[in-house]
A protein has these predicted regions:
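Conserved catalytic scaffold of divalent metal-dependent phosphoesterases
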Residues: 103-197
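N-terminal active-site segment of His-dependent metallophosphoesterases
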Residues: 1-86, 160-169, 374, 385-386
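Beta-strand-turn-beta hairpins that frame and shape the catalytic cleft
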Residues: 17-27, 138-148, 167-172, 219-221, ...
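Accessory, non-catalytic peripheral segments of nucleic-acid enzymes
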Residues: 2-21, 245-386
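Conserved beta-sheet core of the metallophosphoesterase superfamily
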Residues: 185-250
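Divalent metal-coordination and catalytic microenvironments
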Residues: 31, 68, 107, 146, ...
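A short helix->loop->beta-strand "cap" motif at the edges of active sites that frequently abuts
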Residues: 97-102, 201-204
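Active-site environment of divalent metal-dependent phosphoester hydrolases
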Residues: 33-37, 71-74, 103-116, 139, ...
C-alpha cells in the first residue's frame, strides 16, 4: 500500500498540465475518544502517526475530525481535556502552516457532550481557518460547498429534509452517524439512519465517523474507522482517510492510511496444561511469539480453586493479561428458566380465569396421576362428599 506522500505525489503527477489547485486534498479522522485509554498515549499516537504524516504532504486543504473527539463528559482540569486540547492545538498549528481549514464536527452527544465548544475560541483567530460545527450547516472550503451533519437524537425530519433535499447541490458531505447496511442498521437508535437516497444532491463523496471499522457503502459513503485499538474483539484496520477531490470532474480518490495499533487477542483453553506453572509458561510464550499487546484467556473447562489462585496471583498486576474462568452459573440460570417455561406450559390452567376452582383442582389431580385413569369433576365431588 502506498503511503500518504506517495498517494498525493501520484495524483500531482497524473494531473499533467492541469493546475493542481483544482484539487482539494483532505484528511479525515474520527472516533478518537479521549480518554478511552491513557490520554498521553492517545496524544503520542495521533501526533506521530497522523499530524506528522500530514505535515509531509505537498498540499493539504482540509482536515476534518468527523466526530467523537471525546469518549464521555470529562472535567476541564483532567488529563483527557489537557491532551485533547494539546492535540487540537497541534492541528491548528499544522493548518496554519499549510493554510488548510480545520473542521471539528460534533459526534454522538453521549460522547462529545458539547465539549467541542472548548475550541470555539480558535474561530476568533484571523491567521487560521477553524470551524467548530455543532449544527447541520453548509461550509465553503476552497470554493466547494461542504454539508456538515453532526449526530442528533430525535431531530425533526423536516430539518434533515431542508438541508438534504431543499438547499441545492453541494460538493461533499462530512458527518457522524448511522448508514443503512453498516453495523448499526438494525439496532434501536434515536439517531437517524441514512441511505444513499438522502444524498442525491451531493456531487462528491460522503465521509463519516461513528463506525469504528473503515469501509465503503453504496460506492460513495465512507467510514473513517477509529485511529487505534483499545479493546478486545476489535481486529479491524486502524487509521484515517486521505482524499483527493477533483472539483472540476467531481471525481475523487480515497486511501485508508494505516496507523500501527495495539494488538488485542482472545484465545480459549479447555483447562490447564498439566499444571498452573505450565499454563503460565504457555500463556507467556504465546503472547511473546505472536507479538500480542493484550491477551485474554477464556477457560472453557473447570479450573480447580488452587490453580486459580496461582494464576490470579501471578497475573495480578498485569494489565496486558486477562483471565476469564468458566462458570456454570449461566448454564444453571438457563436451565432454571427452561424449567419455569415448561412448568408454566404444564400448569397453564391455574391462571385461566374461565375455569372454576374445582375444575382447576381436577386438572391438577389428573396432571399428577400415575395412570391414564383420569377422574371427572363429578367423580371428584362424589369422593369429597362421601
Amino acid at each position: 500500500m502506498r503511503n500518504a506522500i506517495e498517494f498525493i505525489t501520484d495524483i500531482d503527477n497524473d494531473a499533467g498540465d492541469i493546475i493542481f489547485s483544482k484539487f482539494i486534498v483532505s484528511a479525515h479522522i474520527s472516533d478518537i475518544h479521549f480518554p478511552v485509554m491513557d490520554p498521553r498515549k492517545q496524544y503520542d499516537i495521533l501526533c506521530k502517526q497522523f499530524i506528522d504524516r500530514l505535515r509531509q504532504l505537498q498540499q493539504l486543504d482540509l482536515v476534518c475530525i468527523n466526530g467523537d473527539l471525546f469518549d464521555h463528559k470529562v472535567m476541564t482540569s483532567s488529563d483527557a481535556t489537557y491532551y485533547a486540547s494539546l492535540f487540537i492545538a497541534k492541528l491548528v498549528e499544522l493548518c496554519k502552516e499549510k493554510r488548510a481549514t480545520l473542521i471539528i464536527l460534533q459526534g454522538t452527544i453521549s460522547h462529545d457532550n458539547n465539549q467541542v465548544k472548548l475550541y470555539y475560541h480558535y474561530m476568533e483567530q484571523t491567521d487560521v481557518d477553524v470551524r467548530v460545527v455543532t449544527n447541520i450547516q453548509f461550509e465553503v472550503v476552497k470554493n466547494s460547498v461542504v454539508l456538515c451533519i453532526p449526530e442528533f437524537n430525535n431531530l425533526p425530519e423536516e430539518v434533515y429534509d431542508k438541508y438534504l433535499n431543499r438547499s441545492g447541490f453541494y460538493d461533499m458531505c462530512i458527518m457522524h452517524g448511522n448508514f443503512k447496511g453498516a453495523v448499526y442498521e438494525d439496532s434501536p437508535s434515536n439517531s437517524r439512519i441514512f441511505t444513499m437516497e438522502d444524498f442525491c444532491n451531493c456531487r462528491g463523496p460522503i465521509v463519516s465517523g461513528h463506525i469504528h471499522k473503515p469501509g465503503c457503502y453504496s460506492d460513495h459513503f465512507y467510514y473513517c474507522g477509529s485511529p487505534y485499538r483499545w479493546r478486545f474483539d476489535d481486529d479491524h484496520d486502524k487509521g484515517f482517510v486521505l482524499m483527493v477531490f477533483d472539483t472540476v470532474s467531481r471525481t475523487y480518490q480515497m486511501q485508508n492510511v494505516l496507523i500501527e495499533s495495539d494488538i488485542y487477542r482472545t484465545i480459549q483453553m479447555d483447562g490447564l496444561l498439566n499444571d498452573a506453572k505450565d499454563t503460565i509458561d504457555h500463556i507467556e510464550r504465546f503472547k511473546k511469539d505472536n507479538h500480542i499487546d493484550y491477551l485474554r484467556i477464556k477457560f472453557t473447562g473447570d479450573v480447580d480453586m488452587a490453580s486459580k489462585m496461582i494464576l490470579n496471583n501471578y497475573f495480578r498486576d498485569r494489565e496486558d493479561i486477562t483471565l476469564v474462568y468458566y462458570s456454570n452459573e449461566k448454564e444453571m440460570q438457563e436451565t432454571a428458566e427452561k424449567r419455569i417455561v415448561e412448568q408454566s406450559k404444564e400448569y397453564w390452567f391455574l391462571l385461566d380465569n374461565n375455569l372454576t376452582d374445582m375444575q382447576k383442582f381436577v386438572m391438577w389431580v389428573n396432571s399428577h396421576a400415575e395412570t391414564d385413569n383420569y377422574i371427572t369433576e363429578d367423580e371428584l365431588n362424589v369422593m369429597l362428599s362421601g
